[in-house]
Amino acid sequence: MPSIQELIKGVKSTDRASLGRAITLIESNLPDHRELAQELLAELLPASGSAHRVGITGVPGVGKSTFIETLGTKLTGLGHRVAVLTVDPTSSRTGGSILGDKTRMASLANHPSAFVRPSPTSGELGGVNRMTRETMLICEAAGFDVVLVETVGVGQS
C-alpha cells in the first residue's frame, strides 16, 4: 500500500486507484488501519464539503441503479463530476458486496468524469454502511461536485 501522503496526493489528483485504495483503508476493520484512516481523513477534510449529496433509496428492483446511471450520465454531460457510492448487502462468506450495482452502471462507471464504488453494508442497518459519510468526504476531496448514494434495497439490511 502507498504511503498516506501518496494516497492524499493521488486522491486530490482524482487518481482512481488512489481513490479506491483510500476508500478501502477507510472501510477497513483492521486495527492498524484505523490510525492511518484518521490521518488520511484529517488531511482531506479541508478539501471536502462543497458537493451536492443525494441519497436514493427504494425497494429491490424498483430501478435505483437505472435511475442513477441516467441521472449521472446527464450530470456528467452538463460538466459535473459525479461519484456514485452504492451500498449492497454483505456476503456472509466473503464480507464483500453480493449484488454489485456497479455492473448495472457500466456506462457511467467507465465515464472519465464519474466514479462508481460499491461497498457492503458490513452488517449495518439503515441502508448505508458505517463509513459512508467518510467515503463521501473522500470523493469530495477528489473533486467530485455531486455525490450520489444508493442505499441497500429496502428490506435487504
Predicted regions span which residues?
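Residues at the beta-strand->loop junction immediately N-terminal to the Walker
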Residues: T57
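Nucleotide-state-sensitive switch-loop elements of NTP-binding domains
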Residues: S3-V54, V62, I68-S157
